[in-house]
Amino acid sequence: MSKFNRIHLVVLDSVGIGAAPDADKFFNAGVADTDSDTLGHISETAGLAVPNMAKIGLGHIPRPVPLKTVPAEADPTGYVTKLEEVSLGKDTMTGHWEIMGLNITEPFDTFWDGFPEEIIQKIEAFSGRKVIREANKPYSGTKVIDDFGPRQMETGELIVYTSADPVLQIAAHEEVIPVEELYRICEYARSITLERPALLGRIIARPYIGEPGSFTRTANRRDYAVSPFQDTVLNKLADAGISTYAVGKINDIFNGSGITNDMGHNKSNSHGIDTLIKTLQLPAFTKGLSFTNLVDFDASFGHRRDPEGYRDCLHEFDRRLPEIIANMKDDDLLLITADHGNDPTYAGTDHTREYIPLLAYSASCTGAGVIPQGHFADISATIAENFGVDTAMIGTSFLADLV
């Protein structure tokens, strides 16, 4: 008999809560991540009013300095803590895979100086299109289309770029390079980056529209991941006949492995919340896990180093949190967390090595408060214990703390 019939895991992509102990080993533009603090710096510099997350207990998460504008509520309704990453990476895939119980000890390859000429030439030969060499380096996804979009519109060349993550991204104007053609090229790029010297976590198709000076990336993004190297708790659940529902890019991150129901990509955070609520309302969803990723925090504001936009995005989620809770059953459990940091006030443009917050709420819990600090994989270990399946590689359940 499960303690909770349904568990809903919501990842607020990049919403870190302070530098991790090993942040000195991770860098942004040559600056160690040691002073990164996504939530803390947003609260400090832009102001942060998230009363619904505060009510669950966000302000109670232990920190060297309390969140400036998020109070520690006198009577929180949920359990909270912060979790540390053990894997050797700070990218989306590593974070999500570890949350589901894997320890990534050999990181994927990153290309600070751009991809080898061998890879670029193979993409050119397959696609019949030239690649803009000047874009072949770590680049902000919005800046790269601002810088090279006009040229692409004139020449039809491909914009191939990377980031601090182990990813190869191809940006293409939808009126110049049709989306289906872009997808085919990305599928090929995936096939040639499955082993070293270019072992990549993801290939990302990045379609955009508009005119020079006002380009906009569209919702037709598509991720081509590799399957996890070992079974995650998602696989354990699916193998036991327990439903797993993926909302947003979760299906892409796990390459469909262990996902029994893909609810589709999100056009925005708000659309993703709508999809999550529809998932909660499904008559067939009586037992199992829903797993949601809301990416706008990261993609639209973290990488762009926009603390005010990031703040507003957090406000939007917080305003809609009561809707999510209202569609839960009394014996449901809501887990809100993140996958890494992306401090919008920090140096560089890439992720930051941080603790992630964990908020746990269920109407069936009569207690509340701070539970012991743990690690990312403790989330999947808790889910596994609840549903009576084995854990994956790592993780310690905190199910007994939720009373």
Curated annotation (Swiss-Prot):
CDD domains: PPM (cd16009). GO terms for molecular function: magnesium ion binding; manganese ion binding; phosphopentomutase activity. It is an enzyme of class 5 (isomerase). Pathway: Carbohydrate degradation; 2-deoxy-D-ribose 1-phosphate degradation; D-glyceraldehyde 3-phosphate and acetaldehyde from 2-deoxy-alpha-D-ribose 1-phosphate: step 1/2. Keywords: Cytoplasm, Isomerase, Manganese, Metal-binding. Its cofactor is Mn(2+). It holds the Pfam family Metalloenzyme. SUPFAM superfamilies: Alkaline phosphatase-like, DeoB insert domain-like. It catalyses: 2-deoxy-alpha-D-ribose 1-phosphate = 2-deoxy-D-ribose 5-phosphate; alpha-D-ribose 1-phosphate = D-ribose 5-phosphate. It comes from the Bacteria. Mn(2+) 1 binds at residues 13, 339-340. GO terms for biological process: 2-deoxyribose 1-phosphate catabolic process; 5-phosphoribose 1-diphosphate biosynthetic process; metabolic compound salvage; nucleotide metabolic process. Its EC number is 5.4.2.7. Mn(2+) 2 binds at residues 298, 303, 351. One of its GO terms (cellular component) is cytosol. Belongs to the phosphopentomutase family. Isomerase that catalyzes the conversion of deoxy-ribose 1-phosphate (dRib-1-P) and ribose 1-phosphate (Rib-1-P) to deoxy-ribose 5-phosphate (dRib-5-P) and ribose 5-phosphate (Rib-5-P), respectively. This is Phosphopentomutase. It comes from Streptococcus equi subsp. equi (strain 4047).
